[in-house]
């Protein structure tokens, strides 16, 4: 199922400011509710929540997806005894993508992607989950969203809401808000249901759409171009771009270039040591260092000449080592990388698993402040049984309880990461990460380490030197937190004013060192500082630049940019656009926050950001050679390209608006070289106008038809095959196919298809006329002198008159060529019968040889009947049936049409074999006709209406096709014996068949 993004809204939802419901309101809202559908973000979460709410008495059954089970249990919800049906999705249920015609890389110029329509659809691997939700929704009266309470979780919740409300629009929707899967948390969530927050979901929609547009446009631009320029190196390489990827890569490149540009400098310093009976003490120069050798040498010589040291000051003061702050996501990623050597992606994967198992709180949080209503004492008590840290947990309780060190950040959604349940059954990295979270939590709730710092300052030849010592008095949190180190450094006792002879006074040289390459923790810190990504996406962006080979890792796990990464950053920087800098993306992240807060409109942010990146893209394409030059430094000289068009598909130029969906129709080329107009809404809209195969060249002219609506409808330049047009007509001319010129439509034999082909659906030839006329007639009047304009009017005036019957025995097909005479060889009632067919197979012309010959004037009148009627569908408004003249006023002599109304009788006025022949048709206006047609002179039982005989897929009628399958009566029999009327197999009434039965509509 496809969901247009622009229409994705739930108007019944109240504003998030009023999202809390009173208990009385909830009891009223849920009155009469018997079954409640609950949907979590993952199966493990659904199982855990259901187990806690049901006290372990849930009933499990299978869903349509084998990975997402269904858990049922009885529950008392707001005064109602209800059955809770708990199931899950697997992350995002829907995905963003361009409409089908833009998905292939060669389908359009990448610039189009900034404006191309985007849709939300359900990926194939999630269809079973979607069907499960639809099936369960039909049995339920309310829906409760149990997805994670962050931006992504809120958006996933709205995807679930969209799917469920499509099945049951009046479904009540509620939101459960929780931060951990514990009995208290989930029951509290059930007792305080709120409504989903549309604004938070909107922010995610904006971010997803921008990431798709920007990423797809730049990725296609880079990949298509650089693969052509450097085929030997990049032929198989996907060169992706992302507005978070590139700033992340930029940090790595910037540090690497800083190291490359670093010039070491020699410095000099004076070092003093004193060999005391209690140990060797090193005194540091208060000047630290000097870069001037002579100056340092002079001071050193003064110290050597008078080396006696005088103690000028002895200070002693308390020193504390702070315990860690409450743990948020970014700190978890950084500390796990530094202390445990687990990368950020793996850290978050393990943390998610521990969360769904109920061992820790929600791991994606920006909060480092414990809320006052969170019972920390209970959480500390849970850890007392452990032999490793249980005694420390007990000591916290004995000293008056936990006193956490809080930070200053809160996302108002989740508390800091903390353990929620004790376990000793974990293994490997899961056990290591769980232990780290527990120890961090206990350390945070403990006390700072305490010590006494002593500072001794001495004077030698008026130069000052300092030594520091430390005595730890209370380790406190250090006893449970081995990831921090704080050691004693003993200083001997010195008295102020005392003198001593230093053991050594020496001048030592050193050299400044460059900064180190970034570690993952360093990179995450930079991303957070500059607002690149969120705590939930940092790891993903880092993994992407590694997977694309933009960066690699050194043996000590530091990031080193690759040649491709360096070339891309340098190339864009040389264009004047610092796309590797964080400013553009940081601005977007700030806007997304404002959308969540209701301070900015999502559409305004979307429009501004698209235009900003689109302008950058246009100029980047114009300066693309700078990108080539930057990469050539690493890959060697590449292939020269003459023009941009050698790489990117041309921008499709719209000819007119589609009469079905109002999207642009563009000129395209068929595989065999022919031309047609295709709707940009394909495949949802399959409208197309097929030009005949005799058209050798077709292109859009700059002129616009002044008549056809809606404006603009561009004219076409056409060049025809020699001999395909009457001799009096030019082979090249400019014309309008917007529907204003009936004669031109007949000359071009325009064919229009409005839907997907079916096996039983014949291909008609005048549906172009049907659609074009509808557009033409319904939107502007057609004065008699304006129907033919410009060159098409001149063409119409030079048309030869129709050939009189008997002047030639040749039969002409719809292409204007002489048809070929063939004989039926297949076994059956028509074996041996001869028929005419298109010689080239280009058109669908077909005519039995023993049928009346229409002559060279064109194909038989029946061949002009519309496609829709062959399936029982009424022709569209404005349809002109070829060969039919003006409507007559006669009644149908008792014959009824498909509307069960009396038909009218009309007469064929157009020259041809059927001129003067009468027929019955629907009496309603052309726009409302049911499609009924019957010749008056056909032998039909009085008072009955025959089934319509619309053209089949090869020019013969369905009625004659049905007759050909039965034994054929002799001509005398057919002339003297009335046919038995056929009956419908559905209602058993004569006059029509099942496809045309009113009961089958």
From Swiss-Prot:
SMART domains attached to this UniProt entry: TOP1Ac (SM00437), TOP1Bc (SM00436), TOPRIM (SM00493)
Domain Topo IA-type catalytic: 197-617
Record field: transmembrane: none
Record keywords: Disease variant, DNA-binding, Dwarfism, Isomerase, Magnesium, Metal-binding, Mitochondrion, Primary mitochondrial disease, Progressive external ophthalmoplegia, Repeat, Topoisomerase, Zinc, Zinc-finger
InterPro entries associated with the record: Topo_IA, Topo_IA_2, Topo_IA_AS, Topo_IA_cen, Topo_IA_cen_sub1, Topo_IA_cen_sub2, Topo_IA_cen_sub3, Topo_IA_core_domain
Zinc finger regions, GRF-type: 813-852, 897-939
Enzyme nomenclature, EC number: 5.6.2.1
Bias-annotated ranges (Basic and acidic residues): 953-964
Known tissue expression: High expression is found in testis, heart, skeletal muscle and pancreas.
Stretches the record annotates as Disordered: 400-424, 774-810, 937-1001
PROSITE patterns reported in the protein's UniProt record: TOPO_IA_1, TOPO_IA_2, TOPRIM, ZF_GRF
Catalytic activity: ATP-independent breakage of single-stranded DNA, followed by passage and rejoining
Effect of residue 100 to V: In PEOB5; results in decreased DNA decatenation
Stored Pfam families: Topoisom_bac (PF01131), Toprim (PF01751), Zn_ribbon_GRF (PF06839), Zn_ribbon_Top1 (PF01396)
Oligomer status and interactors: Binds ssDNA. Interacts (via N-terminal region) with BLM; the interaction is direct. Directly interacts with RMI1. Component of the RMI complex, containing at least TOP3A, RMI1 and RMI2. The RMI complex interacts with BLM.
Protein function: Releases the supercoiling and torsional tension of DNA introduced during the DNA replication and transcription by transiently cleaving and rejoining one strand of the DNA duplex. Introduces a single-strand break via transesterification at a target site in duplex DNA. The scissile phosphodiester is attacked by the catalytic tyrosine of the enzyme, resulting in the formation of a DNA-(5'-phosphotyrosyl)-enzyme intermediate and the expulsion of a 3'-OH DNA strand. The free DNA strand then undergoes passage around the unbroken strand thus removing DNA supercoils.
Protein name as catalogued: DNA topoisomerase 3-alpha
Organism of provenance: Homo sapiens (Human)
